[in-house]
Amino acid sequence: MRGDHITLVRNDKYWQQGRPYLDRIIAKFIGAPSSRILALQAGELDYIEYYWFPLDSYKLVANDKRFQTAEVSYPTITHLLINTKQPPLDNPKVRQALMVALDRNYIQKNVFFGLGQPAVSTFDSRIEWAYNPKVNYEKMYPYDPAKAKAMLDEAGIKAGADGTRFTINFLFDSTRPDFLQAAQAIQRFWQDVGVKVNLQGAERAVTLKRVYTDYDFGVTLQTYTTSGDPALGIARAFVTESIKQGSNFNNVSRYSKPEVDDLFNKGRDASSREERAKYYYRVQEILAQDLPTLTLHQDALIDVASVRVHNIFSGGQFPLWDIVWMDK
């Protein structure tokens, strides 16, 4: 059908003789996650890249001898991005209370199917040289709804006659089943401490516009990759120069602190990993107190392919398509 796929044809003049091995690659666009899995099972697809693979199907394909899976080694965190210009979310004490009200281990086990792990910092702990082991949200903000209520009381956010303290508009990408399930779990946890949550699911394009252009949200669920280095993938979520309305995946929380800007800049420019780590360690300590985002989960990115496909997992984040080949 016109418009539902792209066909890539082998370049016979490719610089490396004999490659690529495949005559053509057909990339199909399949919107519904369940339809992608059905197409895989029917043999209509040979490979689903991690971004499009629904995690709720992991056990199904992992236990099927027709398929092979691999976790992509690419540190990625799912954040709850906070609109820090919207009261009472502008108060770090309120954000800390919201973190304490979250059972992130429950979300990891029941939403992300035990894959990945609860995030322990704004820095993915898999970036071992830059992660500060003294910053651990599991220890700093353990799940404790009674304590969260007390923290909100101390912040001056008292419960009304109906038990409600304030209301959050929670925007998420409704095309991702894991985001829907995570949003529903978070709604329950926060409502347990008197915070009413209006869930607002929308398609990705609508969500991105409302978040990054219109700033029309209280909290939103987004996934940020680290791009392999804090200077590339982490700083953009927290430095002042990344507050750019209309530009996606930047500092949409609009958090701004000169000390944090300075530390990220020094961490970027330092000449050794040891020196860079010194600045990044300090910035994590500050962000752990300010919590402009609530880091939810260190994601496991899963690729799946037919066992007929070879060398498909050889390229790290993306396949090296020139060496991929298939059984006939």
Residue ranges of predicted features:
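Structural transition elements
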Residues: 118-155, 174-181
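Gly/Pro-rich hinge or "lid" segments in bacterial periplasmic/extracellular proteins
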Residues: 1-24, 146, 150
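Short helix-loop capping/hinge motifs at secondary-structure junctions, enriched
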Residues: 14-17, 86-94, 158-159
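Second-shell loop/turn segments in exported
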Residues: 26, 83-87, 94-97, 132-141, ...
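Ligand-site clamp/hinge motif
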Residues: 11-60, 187, 196-198
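Short helices/loops that flank or line small-molecule/ion binding pockets
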Residues: 34-45, 64, 92-93, 184-193, ...
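Detector for C-terminal structural segments
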Residues: 3-5, 10, 77-78, 101-131, ...
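Short beta-strand and adjacent tight-turn residues that come in two discontinuous sequence segments
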Residues: 48-50, 202, 220-222
